[in-house]
């Protein structure tokens, strides 16, 4: 039986991965959270991978606190760069493939159209810079690596924009939401499904072109538009009785420690052509909004 190792299994994406793989039942799955596998601990990484000898490693472990990373630079780089290095070095010993999750924040957002995998990266913040360096290192070290860039992740688990909006709606009459940043909201369950589909192709020996791929939800919208859609669905499904007045504001109106790209829209042509994978439908995923409110 093929063996899959999931890192970061306690996080938003990791929990989605673990659930899908347990339901799948076709693989021997080792899903480890931070307490069980700290990817910044080289000895721990090598010990677990040497013992389990996974066919595929899905790395869902990451430092994702975008603003906090500006204050904790070394912590962000430790997880997003050094941790990735240790995984790659251990994987090489067993010819394990690595599927690694990255971010739209490797781009500066100045492009007018959607970003392709071949576009030059230019991150604006520490988080984006650390993820970009992790990408570079992984591609350098591991010939059997796939990097999946995604954006604006939401789902049942962890902290995300949908959960934040539903929480704020309970005690706010008015909300200001940024309208001059656009991107593709992406359901974490769909990201997990895509990673598993790719892992399965590797396991059965299909010819897979390793490298960078983009996968997000469509259509691209602003945070403001996404918030409106969330509240519309919440009211329709009686998750909320009343919703706040939502005002469109600019990035300048809502200063943050980390600078974010104005355009996070990613081109999905490559993954569609290579794997037949279609975009995530975030509007469909919002139909499950009751689960995000719990």
Swiss-Prot record:
One of its GO terms (molecular function) is dTDP-4-dehydrorhamnose reductase activity. Involved in the biosynthesis of the dTDP-L-rhamnose which is an important component of lipopolysaccharide (LPS). Catalyzes the reduction of dTDP-6-deoxy-L-lyxo-4-hexulose to yield dTDP-L-rhamnose. NADH binds at residues 11-13, 38-39, 62-64, 127, 131. Its cofactor is Mg(2+). SUPFAM superfamilies: NAD(P)-binding Rossmann-fold domains. The active site is at 127 (proton donor/acceptor). Keywords: Carbohydrate metabolism, Lipopolysaccharide biosynthesis, Magnesium, Metal-binding, NAD, NADP, Oxidoreductase. This is dTDP-4-dehydrorhamnose reductase. Binds 1 Mg(2+) ion per monomer. GO terms for biological process: dTDP-rhamnose biosynthetic process; O antigen biosynthetic process. Pathway: Carbohydrate biosynthesis; dTDP-L-rhamnose biosynthesis; Bacterial outer membrane biogenesis; LPS O-antigen biosynthesis.
